[in-house]
Amino acid sequence: LAAAVAAISFASPAQAVTDIMWWHAMSGELGRQLEKLAADFNASQSEYRIVPGYKGNYTETVTAAIFAFRSRSQPAIVQVNEIATGTMMAARGAIYPVFELMRDQAEAFSPAAYLPAVTGYYADVAGNMLSFPFNASTPILYYNKNMFRSAGLDPEISPKTWPEVGAAAKRLRASGAVCGFTTSWPSWINVENFSAFHNLPISTKANGFDGLDAVLTFNKPAVVRHIAQLVEWQATKMFDYSGRATSAEPRFQNGECAIFIGSSATRADIRANSKFEVGYGMLPYWPDVQGAPQNTIIGGATLWVLRDRPRDEYKGVAKFFSFLSKPEIQAAWHQNTGYLPVTRAAFDLTREQGFYDRNPGAAISIEQVTLKPPTENSKGVRLGSFVLIRGVIEEELEQAFSGKKSAQAALDSAVERGNRLLRQFERANPDR
C-alpha cells in the first residue's frame, strides 16, 4: 500500500493542470462560441485549463475585476470593451501588457499581423500591443430589400451618402414604412464613428492618444449639422430614435424600420431572424465634407491580463493567446460570430474558403475599416472615463431628439460635461 501511495504521489505533479480564470461579458450564442474556444484550447494540450466565467455586461465585468483585484481574487484574463482602454491603461500596476507577457513567455506575437484599425486602437505610442484583440466590430448599414421594392427603390443599391439615406427614407415612409431608418448605439455611430468616417477629431491630443489633457471638440459644424438633420427627419419619422445600445435592432427585424445602422457583429443574427431579404452597405457619409469617407473605428473588446497571479498561469495565458492567433481559429470565430477578422491572415483564409461569396455583406465591415490608412482622427478614441462620457453624449442626444434642446446646445452641453469628467480623470492620474 505504501508503495502504491508513493507511486500516486510521484505521478500527481505530472498530471496537474493549471486552471486559468477568464472573466467575460458574452451571453447567449456568443457566450457559447467563447466557451467553445476555451474547450478547443483545453483539448489541444494537457497543461492548462481555461475556465470562462460570465460576469454580466462589459461594465459589470470590468467592475467585478476591479473589486476582485483589490481583494486579490482577480482572474488572469478579463474581457474589456474598447472605450475602457484609456481607463485600463491608467491602471499600470494592475495590468500586464500583452506585448510584455508574450515576450517574457517567449511566444511569437507580431502587431503587424493585425489590421491597422486594431493595432492603432490598442497599442501604445511605440506600437506595442497592450491587450489582446478579441472581438471587434464596426457599424454598417442594413436595409430591407422587400420594402425597397415596394417603395420603387433599387433593392441592389444601398444608400451611400446621408442625402441618399434621406431620399430613400422619404420614399419608404410614403410607401407605408413605420420609420425610414434608425440606428443603434447613438454615440458610437452618430458621433464617434461619424467623426472618424469624416476624418474629424473627437478631441484634441489625437483623440486622447497623446495625453490626458485632451479636450473634447466634437461640437463643431459637421457633427452639429448631422444631428440637426436627424432631428429634422424625426419630425416625419424618416428617422426615428429607438434608444440606446441595441434597442433599435428589433425594429428592423420586425419590419418597422426599413433601414438600420448597427454593429457588423449583429449581421448573423439579423440574417437568421429577419423574415425578409436583407441588403448591406457601408456607413453613410456627407459628400461635401472634405476627406470623407475615411475609415470607421472599431467597437467590441480585447482581453487584458491582470497582474499578481501565479507565474505558471502566465505561461498558459501566453499559449492560449498564441492558440487564438492561429488563422484557422480567428477565421472560425469571425465566421461563427460576425465579428471582424482581426488579422489579415484570417481575412485571407475566410475569403479563400468562399465565405464572403456565400454570405453577402460579410466583407463590408473589413472593407470599411481598411478603406484608408487610419489618421489621428480615425484610429480610435483613448479618453479617460469614456464609458461615462459616452453616457453623457447619449443623454444630450436624447435632449435633441426629444426637442428639448437644439443640436448645437445638446452637443455644447455634452462637450462641457464630458470635459469635466476628463479633468477629474486627469487629476486622479497625475503620473500618467
What residue ranges belong to the model's regions?
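Glycine-centered hinge/linker elements that transmit conformational signals in sensory
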Residues: G166-R171, F209-S242
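Short, solvent-exposed loop/beta-turn-alpha elements that line the ligand-binding surface or hinge
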Residues: F99-Y114, S158, L200-R225, A272-N273, ...
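Extracytoplasmic/periplasmic solute-binding protein
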Residues: A123-F134, P139, P163-V215, C257
